[in-house]
A protein has these predicted regions:
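Extracytoplasmic, non-cytosolic globular domains
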Residues: 59-75, 136-239
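Structured beta-strand-rich core segments of catalytic domains in phosphoester-bond hydrolases
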Residues: 80-158
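N-terminal, active-site-proximal structural segment of metallo-dependent hydrolase catalytic domains
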Residues: 20-97, 103-108, 178-185, 196, ...
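Extracellular structured ligand-interaction cores
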Residues: 43-48, 72, 107-109, 115, ...
Length: 302
């Protein structure tokens, strides 16, 4: 009789355990520390990513896995030191092609784009002879996605400064970034007045600052024409959401023209910093082998 009771108790225990099953992962990204997926099949997904003197010290094997895992339609890169190394990397990533400019010998700007979803119509640089505001000339990419045209303007602004705009010093870092914004605004309003424009990159300054030393006022003063899609991050920065966490700074930005306001809203106003270090399972490993910047991405619908 005791053996029968034991068998019954074991059966009851097994039934209870099997009924519990596995926890259902409602949001895989929050539960899987290696998940860095950003893009969807129904949106135009654009990312900016400073790769910190690529390929110096870069874990190429990991980076070649991370890029398709992000699942962006276009990624704009900064700090590409070796043209051939970047092109070789692109050749090893299925379904992606590369554009790298030659306007500078180092700290180049570049793009990777998904050839299944994006067509590149044209690529060119502007302000090549204006190195004071633009130590790296802006790199434009004219693309078609879902039968619509878009203009991306990839930038890497002058770094450093002291949170003071000295208009009397032509080499003042903040003044140079301020001039870069003013000239980009002029170029867009003059040459691309009705285009869907995305200005993005490592802009090396913060957008949520007092007017007296905010270098982005030429854009911020025109809310009917421009919007920084990452502004919610900038006004509430934390270690977990900024693009440059080592100094708790958010300096990588995505600006859209008013032709994209509805598309941004239609995609849920979704712009965020991608915690790419999750792929490496630690910030220190990521910072040492990939970059000291996190990628920032935006979704647009059509």
């Amino acid at each position: 009789m005791s053996n029968r009771k034991t068998v019954i108790m074991l059966l009851i225990t097994l039934v209870i355990l099997s009924a519990c099953g596995k926890n259902t992962i409602l949001n895989p990204e929050e539960n899987d520390p290696t998940s860095i997926t950003f893009g969807t099949n129904n949106t135009l997904d654009i990312v900016t990513w400073n790769l910190k003197t690529f390929p110096e010290g870069t874990d190429l094997a990991s980076l070649k896995q991370m890029i398709p895992a992000i699942n962006a339609d276009v990624i704009a890169f900064q700090e590409i030191m070796d043209y051939n190394a970047f092109m070789d990397m692109a050749d090893d990533i299925p379904n992606y092609a590369a554009c790298v400019y030659t306007a500078t010998d180092a700290y180049r700007l570049a793009y990777l784009y998904d050839t299944r979803t994006v067509t590149v119509n044209e690529q060119y640089t502007i302000y090549e002879n204006d190195s004071n505001p633009f130590p790296r000339p802006p790199y434009l990419l004219n693309i078609t996605w879902n039968n619509e045209n878009y203009i991306l303007i990839n930038n890497h602004f002058k770094a450093y400064g002291d949170n003071n705009i000295d208009a009397s010093d032509s080499w003042d870092e903040e003044r140079r970034r301020q001039l870069a914004c003013e000239e980009l605004d002029y170029y867009i309003s003059t040459n691309l007045p009705d285009s869907r424009v995305i200005v993005l990159g490592d802009l090396n300054d913060q957008i949520a600052e007092p007017d007296e030393y905010n270098v982005f006022l030429s854009f911020l003063a025109k809310p009917q024409e421009y919007y920084f899609a990452d502004m919610p991050i900038a006004i509430a920065p934390t270690y977990s959401n900024v693009s440059y966490p080592s100094s708790l700074s958010h300096i990588d930005h995505i600006l859209i023209s008013n032709e994209l306001f509805a598309d941004f809203e239609g995609a849920g106003k979704y712009c965020r910093t991608i915690l790419a270090e999750n792929w490496m399972l630690s910030w220190n490993t990521y910072a040492a082998t990939i970059s000291d910047h996190r990628p920032v991405g935006i979704r647009l619908s059509r």
